[in-house]
Amino acid sequence: MTKDQKLYKSLIIADLKIASDNYDSADKALRLQAAYHAQQAIEKTIKLKAELCGLNLWGHEIDVLIKKCDDAKIKIDIPKLIRDKADMYTQWEAECRYYPVKVVRKDSIKRAIDTVIKWLHSGNTI
């Protein structure tokens, strides 16, 4: 991994820490920020793993990023939960920052966090 890729990975870890520290907060604004940072961790992990396989991705839509990886036939073992909930996670990117009436379940955020942590440290690419 290059120095820049290691720095990028540190951003993912920071997103996961923010999400982990706040997903079960009594403060709804903090929970929404936790969901946003969980989404960012998903997005950035896809992008980092793809880059390590030679594919440079841009954008925020999780399903589009997954499709680009699939179309390029790169093997980054995107977890089933991420694939199945891609649309929901994509919504977290903007809705959790700008729409305080958005409802996000604590357990959904926690599952996303746990899945990314496991995925980030799996395989031989990271």
Language-model regions, residue ranges each:
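Terminal alpha-helical segments
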Residues: 1-126
